[in-house]
Structures are given as C-alpha cells and as structure tokens.
Amino acid sequence: MIPAQFTYRRVSSVDEALAAVAEHGD
C-alpha cells in the first residue's frame, strides 16, 4: 500500500485511522 499525498495524521485508535481513510479516500 502506497500512501496518498495528504497531511500525515497521527492516529491513536483504529476508529481514528478509519475516519482518516474515509475522509481522504483510499
């Protein structure tokens, strides 16, 4: 998986990670 170019977010939970993916796309 190659990360898309967006502002890096430090996530502290799976929910936050999923929210970030949902917001920015896969």
Swiss-Prot record:
Q: What class of enzyme is it?
A: oxidoreductase
**Do the record's keywords include Transit peptide?**
no
Q: Which cofactor does it need?
A: FAD
User: Is the Glycoprotein keyword given for this protein?
Assistant: no
Enzyme Commission number, as recorded: 1.2.5.2
Q: Which UniProt keywords apply?
A: FAD, Flavoprotein, Oxidoreductase
What catalytic activity does the UniProt entry give for this protein? an aldehyde + a quinone + H2O = a quinol + a carboxylate + H(+)
Q: How is the cofactor bound?
A: Binds 1 FAD per subunit.
Q: What InterPro entries is this protein classified in?
A: FAD-bd_PCMH_sub1
Molecular function (GO) terms for this protein are:
aldehyde dehydrogenase (quinone) activity
Task: Spell out the subunit comment.
Answer: Heterotrimer composed of an alpha, a beta and a gamma chain.
What is the name listed in the Swiss-Prot or TrEMBL entry for this protein?
Answer: Aldehyde dehydrogenase beta chain
Source organism (scientific name): Amycolatopsis methanolica
